[in-house]
Amino acid sequence: VFLYLLLLHFKLPVFYSVIISIGITFLSPQLARMPGHFSLSYVFAIPAMLYLIAKFDQRNRYCISVIIGLFVLWALGTHVYMLGFHASIIMLYWIFKFLYNKETCKNRKNYLHLAIQFIGPLIIFIAFTAFTDPVSDRTAYPWGFLFYRAYPESIFLPLGKPYAQFLLNFSDFKYINWEGIAFVGIVASIGFLIAIVFFIIYIAKNRLKSFPQPSEKYMMNVFFWASLIMLLYSFGIPFIIGDASQLIHYLGPLKQMRGIARFSWLFFYMINIFIFYHIWNLRKKGLNRVIWVILLVLTTSFLYYDAYINVRFWSKQVNNSIPALNDHQNRTDENMWLKEIDISNFQATIPIPYFHVGSENIWVNATCGITRPTYLVSWKTGLPTMGVMLSRTSISQTLENIELFNEPYRRPAILNKLIPGKSYLIVTIDDCIDIPPIQKKMIDKSIVLYQSDDFSLYECPWDSLVSVHNNPFYEILFEINEEELFAYGDYLTDHSVMNFQIESFSENSGDDYYIIPGSYSVRLQKGSWIYHKDIPNFEAGTEYIISFWVNDLRKDLFMRSRFELQLRDSLNQGHDAWKPELFRNVKAFDGNWALIERSFHFKNPGDIIRWHITNNDLRRTEYTVSHIMIRPSHTNIYRKGDGWLMKNNRFFMP
């Protein structure tokens, strides 16, 4: 409706406005958000703001400003990206107005209008969020700012369209994330190319003595240039130029809107309005009537064909019928499991394999298709789930959740926040092979309730959940006292030959260390390597494990640092390298310390290990390493301390 009204505002006839507005609506990239990010699929949101601003410019009424302000509040409560769209329209409108009309700057009423339209609603939203959000440690650096960006190809090329398969002969376009696709339509693409040609001719003739006006409509020009600015921003400009990516750190809260490709949507609407407006007005500029009619038919047909392809594709995604959910009375065979369990016995569901995505610091990705049965069981039972698939979750809460499903070490803090004595409902897939040992142990200690090819349900009693995290201190003490071990300095090993290396940094005594005094601090920048050579009784081809404790686990962005490990020969030439994110090698947590562990294979006698942790976004930040251990995977290393026992770099206390 608002597209139609906007076209009428620009003096296009009713029947043409109806036809074009329908075509643009069904071509909209916002339809792609119906299968997910549903609140971003409100196709009216951007055209409505364009229409309201156009009407405000025409009438300059406070009532329109109030409507705009209320609309911004609605946008803020719907999805924060809606604020981004509306803010870009409102603020760029006022910037153009202030720049090109000096009288506007002098009129104090205009500042009041701006306050009503945008500043006031924004302040209300910030205040409301500050008073209602109990979480204070969400990430300030969400991942993907330059990954979820648009490309000229994703905007102007008909990628994936039946008539453009030949484009795959030039590139597979795999570097384009689906978030970046906002095809404007073949008509708008060709029209924009022609507009660029005319723009170049204009510059050649006028040498930019006056600012180019794409149309005779002032507001269309304002919206066009505003949309073009946002298109460039969606490409990642200026951040993709040289080393300008560091500028992202100065964006403040704007960093939270990491899906910058979405800002190309404003351009999608405006370039289509702009092109079809000019096509209609070609007749007034002297184009032959027959040619004009043919052009109208062809361009409108192509618009509808592109729209049809878009709708046909996304309709299949939206029509995602799940029979089990459609059975509201739970009478079908696939919902019979509900009659076999007493929901009141459980406090939540636990998906195994466990998944937790959302903190932007640590990812535990879902495997074995566990998300579908997890959501299904949670939906049917009404039980909350401990599985997480969100964004901007609390970093501390994330660590508490993940700690429960990591290998046993310290008693998980989250156990003190759960309801003691009440069971958990485990949702799992029996033939999944990607289940970590501790989670397998949870299943082994649970009671089978239901099994099928799709998923299985187990009752995990409270005592069973707690027992998998029992302190192994006395088990390790038994191993030390009863097994045949060999002493090498302060350490004991079950191997008769010393074949491990310890770096405790004992010469660097200070307050910042883990259990054993000694640590090493260095900046998160390239070049600060830690070397290990002359491994005793080196065994080529044997699996080795390097482990160490590192501080700053809870610092935002730190666990996204890269742990770069290299193997180099005796001539210092590299032959193997790994560069995973730090969180992918975390084995245990303890306060602000994390145990990092990775396996590798030596290949040649005299191989040297070197490694460091880097983070371009935290390059001036120091990290602290404590107690590095390199050992063959078949060898266990022990040590007794004052009130603690160590096994394979894990320190246990009674």
Description of each model-found segment:
Residues 305-531, 539-541, 614-622, 630-638, ...:
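Extracytoplasmic
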Residues 1-10, 15-57, 61-98, 117-125, ...:
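Membrane-embedded helix bundles of polyisoprenyl
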Residues 84-119, 199-209:
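Perimembrane helix-loop-helix junctions
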Residues 91, 118-119, 273, 279-308:
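Signature aromatic-anchored transmembrane alpha helix within multi-pass, membrane-resident enzymes
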Residues 32-40, 151, 170-176, 180, ...:
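Membrane-helix boundary/interfacial segments in multi-pass membrane proteins
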Residues 573-608, 618-620:
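Extracellular carbohydrate recognition and processing domains
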Residues 124-200, 606:
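Periplasmic/ER-lumenal interhelical loops and adjacent helix-loop junctions
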Residues 71, 105-131, 142-147, 222-227:
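Hydrophobic alpha-helical membrane-interfacial segments at the cytosolic entry of transmembrane helices
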